Amino acid sequence: MKRQRIVIKIGSSSLTTKQGALDLEKLEGYVRAIVNLRKAGHEVILISSGAVAAGFSRLGYPVRPTTMAGKQAAAAVGQALLMQHYMERFHQHGIIAAQLLLTRKDFQNQTQYTNAYSALMELLKRGALPIINENDSTSIAELTFGDNDMLSALVSGLIHAHTLCILTDVNGLYDANPKTHPNAKRYQYLPTIPDEMLQMGGEAGSNVGTGGMKSKVAAAQTALSLGVDVFIGKASGEHALLDILSGKGDGTYVGNTGDLMEGKTKQWIRLHSPVSGVVRIDQGAERAIMNEGKSLLPAGVTSVHGTFQAGDVVHIWNEQNKVIAKGQVTLSSEQLRKVQGRKSDEAKQLIPLVRDEVVHRDQLVIQEKELNES
């Protein structure tokens, strides 16, 4: 089997008892399965939920708390306990486990995004096992990942994983909810995620998680767009993860992306970066960036809207005021207004240009379809 870089996402429902407490027997089973993956030569990154489940009983809650403050308090206690269990068990197999806590803000800020990438690459290089969870103690409702489902997809793209395994208590994707429709058909394989499946995914599943199939389907769609194949389903037994990689998993396989990986800079621009302004361009510039893969030059800019600095990200509009792309500018809005519509040689006479391009093609992502059809 070809050596792969694999992201394993374990949801709360797969790590807990019926009462919602952390199930150490289940955790031990996943540890053994991951150890076998590593022995087979694969690189593994673990995205693990379970901090709230591990901590709420220690604080005297009879059941999993439902308030944000309660969840954050339970996570503050539980994250340390969860990592302690993982580190002790992986240590028995000679594996160093490393903890990373992330929030959406870590993805939105380019410096923090790049730092997360560098840290993960160094850990893999050193043979450590990164264990990632959302920083539940500081996250707020608007910035959460949905039981780490979307977090696992974004991390998979960031580190150029070959496969994302989203493990849950349901054995795959169905054409209807199998809990309410006994004759629901399970999909063994899907080449893509149809839009209608996002609408029928349902809400949060068990009372110990925040994901549900809808968030898993959305995460799978994001991972596919980043060039990562996806498995959604169950994994029971120490050889379960190896079975998944060999095509014998108990769940649904999604996608066959091949080599469609997008670099981390373009991923950040497309998925995470805040937009600071708008640059409108003419038909010639639109054709150059859309059809010919070229950079945006000052000559193609017809107007500038908003206030931004060099290094900020802007939307690029065509003459019909449609968003066609998103890119990281090399000039401030003030500088760009001085040189818009000018050829590069003329622009250099007006302001000091570090580069000829307003937006280099390596910092530009086409977004016409995903933005204009929404």
From Swiss-Prot:
Keywords: Amino-acid biosynthesis, ATP-binding, Cytoplasm, Kinase, Nucleotide-binding, Proline biosynthesis, Transferase. GO terms for cellular component: cytosol. ATP binds at K9, T168, D169, T210, G211, G212, M213, K214, S215, K216. Gene3D superfamilies: Acetylglutamate kinase-like, PUA domain. Its EC number is 2.7.2.11. Substrate binds at S49, D136, N148. Residues 276-354 form the PUA domain. It is found in: Cytoplasm. It comes from the Bacteria. GO terms for molecular function: ATP binding; glutamate 5-kinase activity; RNA binding. It is an enzyme of class 2 (transferase). Transmembrane segments: none annotated. Pathway: Amino-acid biosynthesis; L-proline biosynthesis; L-glutamate 5-semialdehyde from L-glutamate: step 1/2. GO terms for biological process: L-proline biosynthetic process. It catalyses: L-glutamate + ATP = L-glutamyl 5-phosphate + ADP. Its main location: cytoplasm. Pfam families: AA_kinase, PUA. Belongs to the glutamate 5-kinase family. Catalyzes the transfer of a phosphate group to glutamate to form L-glutamate 5-phosphate. This is Glutamate 5-kinase. It comes from Halalkalibacterium halodurans (strain ATCC BAA-125 / DSM 18197 / FERM 7344 / JCM 9153 / C-125).
